[in-house]
Amino acid sequence: MPRGLELLIAQTILQGFDAQYGRFLEVTSGAQQRFEQADWHAVQQAMKSRIHLYDHHVGLVVEQLRCITDGKSTDADFLLRVKEHYTRLLPDYPRFEIAESFFNSVYCRLFDHRSLTPERLFIFSSQPERRFRTIPRPLAKDFFPDHGWEPLLMRILSDLPLRLPWQNKSRDIRYIIAHLTETLGEDALPRCHVQVANELFYRNKAAWLVGKLTTPDGTLPFLLPIHRTDEGELFVDTCLTTTAEASIVFGFARSYFMVYAPLPAALVEWLREILPGKTTAELYMAIGCQKHAKTESYREYLCYLAESDEKFIEAPGIRGMVMLVFTLPGFDRVFKIIKDKFAPQKEMSAAHVRACYQLVKEHDRVGRMADTQEFENFVLDKRQIDPALMALLRQEAPEKITDLGEHIVIRHLYIERRMVPLNIWLEQVEGQQLRDAIEEYGNAIRQLAAANIFPGDMLFKNFGVTRHGRVVFYDYDEICYMTEVNFRDIPPARYPEDELASEPWYSVSPGDVFPEEFRHWLCADPRIGPLFEEMHADLFRADYWRALQTRIKEGHVEDVYAYRRRQRFSVRYGAISSTANSS
């Protein structure tokens, strides 16, 4: 290769990333208009298209590089010089951290995920940690209650860029003050102030005002979800001021926010104070930088591995028929491999399973489906693998594994947040905790269905419980759209003997689902059955599911709340209006 080509290649990669992130910001900047126009289907489409942008631009850069190098192979020294030139371009670059991930992605695409070494890739960042600890330009604005909280909140709401009228701004301000007074106390409130992010965070049918509430005792989140009525009037639905509530809003089971972030590292650093339980990977994920979140997730994994002497073991729970799942005992994530052969009742291909995981990545997860990161050629040290797991890997997924002596390479896997399997949770809890878990499970099913997702296999083992007690679906191999399912009532038996027969007396076609049958496996436990019948009996009726299908086919997009219904101002302080409640 001619000298000087290394710099051209480095510049080409960085220019390719510039183009990708420019389009990312362009799609993101349309969020306000989509919200104001209530174009909810465009919201869903923008979410999908923004996810696709990254891989699309990686592909464009790879084609450019193949043209530049005329398809000739490159030696190791040449690649190291390319990385050195690229590193020199980053110190003054505002999105250096994601640019490093983009470089990694281009390299992996060019070399088919081979030779992934720290020398060739940005396994760890080349730049100082948290370079934007001091933010170069303000991301937020401070508001002080010099003349009381009512004018302070009036200024905050009036400063918003939204161009719709308010339904009743004074009422919403009263509700916010009432909440703050209940939470902080009347004496403390005058000594507090608020810092509000300059950009709104858009997701689903809400525009979130995200801020920090500084109190005499510390800093709290200050989150206001702003909705619009069918008539196009704005209202604040609630006020959230605890780290637990904020953690759920920014949770791993939710869709990515649309927030205009030309300096993503600075925004992540700013968010860190009100989301102390979130890792760097989770914060990048929340603002839509999911590919860099994957990089950060891998770094977190490597750091944990370096400080731990634990061995990889099979994950607790009932062994799956499609996926082999393992973990490190103290690590908060699991590793999932598609088996080479599935159980006989699972009539599907590995390609189908991967398509299901991609569907979840692109769809609105409504807080009920765990996000995943996909990896290829994942290397594990054999010394850190429990012998029982090693035997299981060789038995269930030998075609996915390459033995390199001291290491194995797993051709393809997913990393996902670790949760307590719901079936195990239900065995361990009693009383109110059991009731809450069953309520959560039913709510998860309803919210998934309203978002046009049918889980397929609804057994408790396919759901997990988060540290906040939320029930989340994580087994995607039978997932499909609600509109693809034929929900049927079981026909009456022709003769008494029909109900005792081993085969059904009625025809069953592909796509047929009989909700009455759910009762057999969801209500078998005498502790659970009565609770389920009390709270979720309608899930056993085909007409309930068909009614949801009708709403979906008519184009209705359901509201998705990242908090309990009882926290809504309309419930706490009186009805906003029938119109607002139906928005």
Curated annotation (Swiss-Prot):
Function, in words: Bifunctional enzyme which can phosphorylate or dephosphorylate isocitrate dehydrogenase (IDH) on a specific serine residue. This is a regulatory mechanism which enables bacteria to bypass the Krebs cycle via the glyoxylate shunt in response to the source of carbon. When bacteria are grown on glucose, IDH is fully active and unphosphorylated, but when grown on acetate or ethanol, the activity of IDH declines drastically concomitant with its phosphorylation.
Effect of D77N: In strain: S2980, S2983, S3013, S3014, S3015 and S3027
Outcome after substituting S170R: In strain: S3013, S3014, S3015 and S3027
Subcellular location: Cytoplasm
Result after altering E554N: In strain: S3041 and S3044
Effect ascribed to mutating P2S: In strain: S2980 and S2983
Gene transcribed to yield this protein: aceK
Pfam families referenced in this protein's UniProt entry, alphabetically: AceK_kinase, AceK_regulatory
Organism: Salmonella typhimurium (strain LT2 / SGSC1412 / ATCC 700720)
A GO term, aspect molecular function: AMP binding
Resulting phenotype, P151L: In strain: S2980 and S2983
Catalytic site: D371
Name by which UniProt lists this protein: Isocitrate dehydrogenase kinase/phosphatase
